[in-house]
Amino acid sequence: MPDCAIIQGVTIVKRTAYPELATGDQVPQQHIRKATGADRQRISEIRFAVRENRPSNPALIERLVDWLFANSTVWVWEEDGVIQGFSAADPRDESICALFVHPCYERRGIGRALLPLACDVLKDSGYTTAVLSTEAGTRAERFYRTDGWTEVGCKEDGQIIFQKNVWGSTRCSSPSCS
């Protein structure tokens, strides 16, 4: 069986990620797209479901999602019609505002695929660097360090501020980007 299959002429899916599928079974269809207003509820659910970097007040999540849609470009990873993760970048201030994957779908490369798209939003807005912050001692901190982000400071609330050069980075090369 080949490593990849072309579905409907455009979506490439790695079959090796789903070894339980036998030949002839339906292969999940994955793609990344810009979020729409219809995605707000699912994005809120994902933001609430994460185990780390959780807001202390769940009511803040809806306001956060409203803010993301009003002030940033939001990308979603969708598989078989289910949004599994999202990223957002604010082109006004070189920041990556959000990168979250639902816990049920972690460790599958979704965050790694979404992050370059958020960086591209900033690059297209003329920035050479991107900044973001995350709680210390979390998986997110390790993820960003492994991805080449440099610690440049600390917020009053203890979150670590990271920065990365986006000018030399390449656009999302994942076949799932649409």
Name each model feature, range by range.
Residues 2-38, 168-178:
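Conserved N-terminal entry element of GNAT/NAT acetyltransferase domains
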Residues 30, 34-104, 115-116, 121, ...:
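Acetyl-CoA-dependent GNAT
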Residues 78-80, 164-167:
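Active-site beta-strand termini and strand-to-loop segments that position acidic
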Residues 102-108, 136:
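Active-site acidic-Proline motif in GNAT/NAT acetyltransferases
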Residues 115, 137-140, 157-162:
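Short glycine/proline-centered loop/turn elements that form peptide/ligand docking sites
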Residues 122-135:
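Conserved GNAT acetyl-CoA-binding A-motif
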Residues 131-133, 145, 150-164:
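Conserved catalytic-core motifs of GNAT/GCN5-like acyltransferases
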